[in-house]
């Protein structure tokens, strides 16, 4: 007799959720706690939210015999990362009224707000809905925010390629009306049974799913770290279609050798008319073959390695009724954002603003949040988020450029963006403490001060202008993509990090773990030694990551 597979709690909760409804309505009404019921916390993710608490105050509240200071993070779904000035103004106002006040630009080209109390969730969602923004499927075991090369100046065909981010996002949205019923008070027709979701059915995906689109030579989306990466193939000024990479993903678990980061495998080329169907069926294969018994091994990368690339590829071809063509030539040359003013083929202007670790706020005399509000009130610029946690003020007509420039100069944004060091411009950090429940160490609250101490070391070795990428996470889940940066710092315990080095600058190659459990002084000592060797022994314009990979110090 075949062995019956045990259903995990997560799978059971999804299956019995009645289309992601669960008991969320009752949980929200319970005024005796700032928390939701445990099952509802899982379902909440599918609505674009996480329950969190202030970890800085856990001990204090425990001594007073109070429950943890619970709050919620809301993440918006913004395919391709573009919103208008009206959206930004609404976001600014909601952040100030209902959250900590800081707008966090994420590594997946959207924004999230933290510190929202349970009673403020519905007002926040309704405020976003009033300007046609939502958080549907921004988290959970579904397709997440679809990312795309951010700067319109990257290609005359950017608008066409960007459009696919929205089309793919819409095609992979859950069909349930639960979001509208629970948060926006849409009337439920009790006598009408909701049809089964043809894509997600009643169990959704085994785990999160991420899709990115890149326009070579720009790889600002870190394409090969996604479950699906679409590489735009442009010839003679025409978009032909996409090379399709499958199976990227970075999350690992400390001490579990069965988990690992992986870059995507290029399956081949698909003409643009067929790309939506192929993407859809790549998702259905993962839905049907992905591991639902162990969430640590449930991402597509593990499914691909377990089944084999050829099996997975043939299954997609069979379901889509399409064969992959041979991959077409392409080349990535950079992952960095192109800061400052850039003009596109149509003559419009775009200004990339440096936003350290994606934190838009007014602090330490630098009023970035106020500056961006003033820009939004002109109604002369759109707002585009980058996967490097920066912001592009875009689609500015030539006649309006001086107006936007004057605001950037007035608030010091122009100066800040111009003066920041290359390594700081190429830094990324996840939220980590004090709100992320998975964090073992600091990230966004610590990386800026660590870079303060790294910059003099670079200067000592004549490397101040070297655009070395550095990324930090508070745990091994990889949200800031530390496993594919030239320097990756992965938290192991408070104040301690694993040091990873050796990825290339363009995003093709993973780094490797070099040293474990380093404190700050040890990190600086190790980097001092590596920078010294690099400065003396590099070949030509060889990048730091390529140098480390070449000299053979990594096992």
Swiss-Prot record:
SUPFAM superfamilies xref list: Nitrite and sulphite reductase 4Fe-4S domain-like (SSF56014), Nitrite/Sulfite reductase N-terminal domain-like (SSF55124)
Pathway info: Sulfur metabolism; hydrogen sulfide biosynthesis; hydrogen sulfide from sulfite (NADPH route): step 1/1
Domain of life: Bacteria
Keyword entries, A-Z: 4Fe-4S, Amino-acid biosynthesis, Cysteine biosynthesis, Heme, Iron, Iron-sulfur, Metal-binding, NADP, Oxidoreductase
Annotated residues for binding of siroheme: 479
This enzyme's EC code(s): 1.8.1.2
Stored Pfam families: NIR_SIR, NIR_SIR_ferr
Catalytic reaction list: hydrogen sulfide + 3 NADP(+) + 3 H2O = sulfite + 3 NADPH + 4 H(+)
Residue sites binding [4Fe-4S] cluster per the record: 430, 436, 475, 479
A single GO BP: hydrogen sulfide biosynthetic process
Gene Ontology cellular component terms for the protein in this record: sulfite reductase complex (NADPH)
Textual note on the cofactor: Binds 1 siroheme per subunit. Binds 1 [4Fe-4S] cluster per subunit.
Molecular function via GO: 4 iron, 4 sulfur cluster binding; heme binding; metal ion binding; NADP binding; sulfite reductase (ferredoxin) activity; sulfite reductase (NADPH) activity
InterPro entries assigned: CysI, NiRdtase/SiRdtase_haem-b_fer, Nit/Sulf_reduc_fer-like_dom_sf, NO2/SO3_Rdtase_4Fe4S_dom, NO2/SO3_Rdtase_4Fe4S_prot, NO2/SO3_Rdtase_4Fe4S_sf, NO2/SO3_Rdtase_FeS/sirohaem_BS
Cofactor(s) demanded: siroheme; [4Fe-4S] cluster
Functional note: Component of the sulfite reductase complex that catalyzes the 6-electron reduction of sulfite to sulfide. This is one of several activities required for the biosynthesis of L-cysteine from sulfate.
Subunit structure: Alpha(8)-beta(8). The alpha component is a flavoprotein, the beta component is a hemoprotein.
Family recorded in the similarity comment: Belongs to the nitrite and sulfite reductase 4Fe-4S domain family.
Protein name from the UniProt record: Sulfite reductase [NADPH] hemoprotein beta-component
Protein's gene: cysI
